[in-house]
Amino acid sequence: MQGMRFERCDSAAPVTLPSHATILSGLFPPRHGVRDNGTFVLSPAVTTVAELLSQAGYDTAAVVSAIVLARRHGLDQGFRLYDDDLGAGVSAGSAVEERQAEATTTAALAALAGMRPPFFLWVHYYDPHEEYRPPSRFADAASGPHRLYDGEIAYMDSEIGRLLAALPAATVV
């Protein structure tokens, strides 16, 4: 499996919902109309990559890990399955309701098991966000002033690795 490394990445907005509306629509916030987290909803008139792929015969599924991307905000357009059920994997003490990376990966693997090729599976991880609370094995492996943040990154990286290992060999990532 091959990947791509980006040495610079800019976001369309400094908050989650408008940034992800841009990722899925290819439009900047002034065009798609989602300008902040909370009450904004992506208009059904905006076409998403999931809608285009679904129309082209792809099976589509999404697994998201934060309440700010709940289906009520319209990002579910074009997805046959949109798993925004944070369920038992919700991180205690977090400022935002979020599903931790391990639970997100487990949900993504369940979605993947029910998909037929060709498929588009979009998996959203909310780690790392404050409060930084990585599992102790990741926090203990890091050091320095950014130990908890680095532990969150290592934890998420481990879970993405678990997901990638389960993908069929010819999968384009």
Briefly describe each language-model feature range:
Residues 1-173:
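Catalytic domains that recognize anionic headgroups
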